[in-house]
């Protein structure tokens, strides 16, 4: 296992037999990663697990790219890579580890992540434009959060990508209505999300972000949109898949007591066994 690989590196290899299985394992692994610290960005893995599983299911290893614009979502790609046997993520969140809780320019797995929210889409369209010049047909799967839509740079990038017809660009927009200051819709009105992206010239669809088959199907439809970029507005929850979370738990930054961690691991293990039965 390499600690520095990225999904677009030549020679990297993985396969996903069942993205539903992988989504559950992403959640399970994320709990294992957060448990030693007792807190962390577990909610971001819970809301994006199906999106990341679908991206790994359809992406071509060593060709396509993965960009993680909201750096605190990096836990989900890390968990997926670990479950696919690409990385050993022990030490996640510890001082000196490459597997930092908030992604940096040193982070493996993804081709780009950033500290300041709203910058990732600009980098992704740069990849798409450069790949066009190189004659590459690589797709760029780009994770974006709904809170990032409060940043003007996202909309500048959206305009640019549509103007240049960057059909290789596919945004997985995690619409979980959660950010550090509270529910997104109480801070800034960003709806109707899909209609706004469509008005900018994008192929835009609303998707149940926890239906991995629907996400995979939407990614397949996006592949046919080679003349314009695509965005999947994935409706999700930062609590999805963990019934044991207390009702007042802060989904943006979850406190995971030892008792809650054990309950979460037990619940997810049972769900995985039921899926495989």
What do these predicted regions represent?
Residues 109, 113-116, 121-224:
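Thiamine diphosphate
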Residues 33, 43-163:
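Cofactor-binding active-site loop characterized by glycine-rich and histidine/acidic residues
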Residues 50, 72-73, 176-177, 211, ...:
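Glycine-rich beta-alpha junction loops
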Residues 8-9, 58-62, 273:
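Nucleotide/pyrophosphate-binding catalytic subdomain
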Residues 64-66, 138-142, 169, 228-236:
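Generic beta-sheet signal
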Residues 2-5, 212, 217-277:
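Glycine/aspartate-rich loop-and-adjacent alpha/beta segment that forms the canonical ThDP
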Residues 2-26:
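N-terminal hydrophobic or amphipathic helices/low-complexity stretches enriched
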Residues 22-39, 174-176:
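N-terminal capping segment at the start of a domain
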């Amino acid at each position: 296992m390499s600690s520095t690989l990225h999904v677009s590196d030549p020679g990297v290899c993985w396969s996903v037999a069942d993205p539903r299985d992988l989504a559950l394992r992403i959640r399970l692994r994320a709990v294992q990663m957060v448990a030693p610290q007792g807190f962390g960005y577990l909610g971001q893995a819970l809301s994006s697990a199906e999106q990341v599983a679908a991206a790994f299911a359809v992406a071509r290893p060593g060709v396509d790219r993965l960009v993680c614009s909201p750096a605190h979502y990096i836990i989900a790609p890390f968990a997926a890579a670990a479950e696919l046997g690409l990385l050993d993520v022990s030490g996640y969140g510890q001082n000196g580890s490459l597997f930092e809780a908030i992604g940096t320019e040193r982070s493996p797995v993804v081709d780009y992540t950033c500290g300041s929210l709203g910058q990732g889409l600009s980098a992704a369209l740069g990849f798409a434009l450069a790949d066009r010049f190189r004659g590459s047909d690589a797709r760029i799967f780009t994770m974006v959060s709904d809170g990032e839509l409060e940043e003007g740079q996202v909309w500048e990038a959206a305009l640019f990508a549509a103007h240049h017809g960057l059909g290789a660009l596919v945004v997985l927009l995690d619409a979980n209505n959660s950010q550090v200051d509270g529910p997104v819709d109480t801070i800034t009105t960003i709806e109707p999300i899909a209609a706004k992206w469509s008005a900018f010239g994008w192929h835009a669809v609303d998707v149940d972000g926890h239906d991995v088959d629907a996400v995979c199907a939407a990614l397949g439809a996006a592949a046919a949109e080679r003349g314009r970029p695509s965005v999947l507005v994935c409706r999700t929850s930062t609590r999805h898949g963990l019934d044991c979370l207390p009702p007042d738990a802060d989904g943006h930054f979850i406190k995971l007591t030892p008792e809650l961690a054990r309950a979460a691991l037990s619940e997810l293990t049972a769900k995985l066994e039921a899926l495989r039965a």
